Amino acid sequence: AVEVFHNFTLLHDDIMDRSDTRRGKPAVHTRWNDNVAILSGDAMMIYAYKLLCGCDRRVLPQLLETFNETAIGVCEGQQYDMDFESRDDVTVDRYLEMIRLKTGVLLAGALKLGAICAEAQPWQAELLYNFGINVGLAFQLQDDLFDTYGDAAVFGKPIGGDILAGKKTFLLTTALKTADAAT
């Protein structure tokens, strides 16, 4: 369910970012059109819930609560990401909160869902959740570096796309924080 949800977000993200490439291949909206990508993403979201509902009924309420919180967090993070493109006041802390929501919450939610399915203790699920947040932050920070300094053949998309799209990345927010008026 989490993987299907994640891929749904990528379909919609590619439209919002006008990214033509995903994993080295044409993005769905590029190969077909925006409508196909939106409807495919919507169907994937519904299918993710269908998969989730196949889990043990004893833990299903907890799973649904965690899945919904995860989905809302990811959507909030995506909205921040879009909003930041037209803002000049994005700080490193705001950027870190955006990637915590957009990327960290997804990984954290996946780990917590696994813990719930395994009937782990709540404190264990919370430790896994916090670990997922930190892995997500590290992943997104590394992704920012790859977008600037990576190899397009390895990265699976053109280098510099975030810069061209006006994305507020860690590199940009840090540069703006340390720059002075003369720079």
Regions found by a protein language model. Name each.
Residues 1-181:
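Mg2+-dependent prenyl diphosphate-binding active-site environment of isoprenoid biosynthetic enzymes
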